[in-house]
Swiss-Prot record:
Transcription found in the keyword field: no
Residues covered by the PCI domain: 46-208
Quaternary organization: Component of the eukaryotic translation initiation factor 3 (eIF-3) complex. The eIF-3 complex interacts with pix.
Name of protein: Eukaryotic translation initiation factor 3 subunit K
HAMAP family (alphabetical): eIF3k (MF_03010)
Amino acid sequence: MSHLVKMENGQSQTIQEMLGCIERYNPDHLKTLEAYVQDQAKNNTYDLEANLAVLKLYQFNPHMLNIDITYTILLKSLTSLPHTDFVMAKCLLLPQQMKDENVQTIIDLADILERADFTLFWQRAEVNRNMFRHIAGFHDSIRKFVSHVVSTTFQTIRKDLLKELLGGIEDSTLESWIKRNGWKHQGQGLVVVAMQDDKIKTKNITEKIEFDNVGGLMAQCL
């Protein structure tokens, strides 16, 4: 869905155009931005800049705070891990937002993910499943982050452990994630995450430095 922002001169701008000018701080545009946040949740899209603009408007206009939109922005920022979007969003929260019980729950979930305690995360996620039921693709976005961590941590991993880390998924779903990440079955209940040839290899880099680039520096040393 396309969201247009109505300017005082009667013209319309896209949200991206509005965010590039001083109009991003105009509270008259807050309702449009909040609707845009809801569309991101519904359609599994993501716009960090717009979401941070909403939180900034809440800072300037605390009386306009919508706590449900705050939840959605924080949860959407979790779906972008391992990027630091959640930290940026958290830094813009008002004291009244930080005191909210659901906000604290989301912060706890973020801490658990950052510690890579995925088994605990899925347990807490199940208890609080109603909180992000409206976020399309939330679970798969977290599984994508889990896959990233697994790929950078393991060479081989037990199939049963991998299923647990991905949220206790079914075998058929596990197969799709194995295929998606380019992993391979090794037998004996093991999954190969990284082949020996995929290990980081050292590389010699030769840089040619011209005399003109260092002549001035050498002259100063004389």
